[in-house]
Amino acid sequence: MEKKIAVTAGTFDLLHPGHFNTLNFAKKHADELVVIIARDETVKKIKGRSPVIPEEQRKVMIEALKPVDRAVLGSLTNKLEPILEIRPDVIILGPDQTTYQINELKSQLAKHFLYPEILKVEEYVKCPFHSSYDILKEIVRRWCCKELKV
């Protein structure tokens, strides 16, 4: 019997509980979890800033996490490329994905005769630092006007 493969993707810059929630959710739906790590260049284009942690380091960190079986870097030219190579049974999307984005993904994959189940993590983890941006804001708040003691 073939292994059921799930894929999820993200920047995974500053790890927080939301990342772990998504990875654990994904692993519950498959035998093997492959994580696609957004490339530094792609993140800069989309978010207007480079990740704090370089892509190769983010890949190594994600690969070391218990639910993750394998991590790969995303494509610089075609966001579907790693998905088409992996051919997952399930794609896990984060809570910030819209219905439009989900329908667009289904449509794009169907053009390649790929029809995975697409599941969405429905809610955000409720905690003070549930996003990388919140972590960065807190670091700035605590340290921007103080001398760093190294």
From Swiss-Prot:
Its cofactor is a divalent metal cation. Catalyzes the transfer of the AMP portion of ATP to flavin mononucleotide (FMN) to produce flavin adenine dinucleotide (FAD) coenzyme. This is FAD synthase. Signal peptide: none annotated. InterPro entries: Archaeal_FAD_synthase (IPR050385), Cyt_trans-like (IPR004821), FAD_synth_RibL (IPR024902), Rossmann-like_a/b/a_fold (IPR014729). GO terms for biological process: FAD biosynthetic process; FMN metabolic process. ATP binds at T11, F12, H16, P17, G18, H19, D96, Y124. Homodimer. It is an enzyme of class 2 (transferase). Belongs to the archaeal FAD synthase family. Pathway: Cofactor biosynthesis; FAD biosynthesis; FAD from FMN: step 1/1. It comes from Methanococcus maripaludis (strain C5 / ATCC BAA-1333). HAMAP family: FAD_synth_arch.
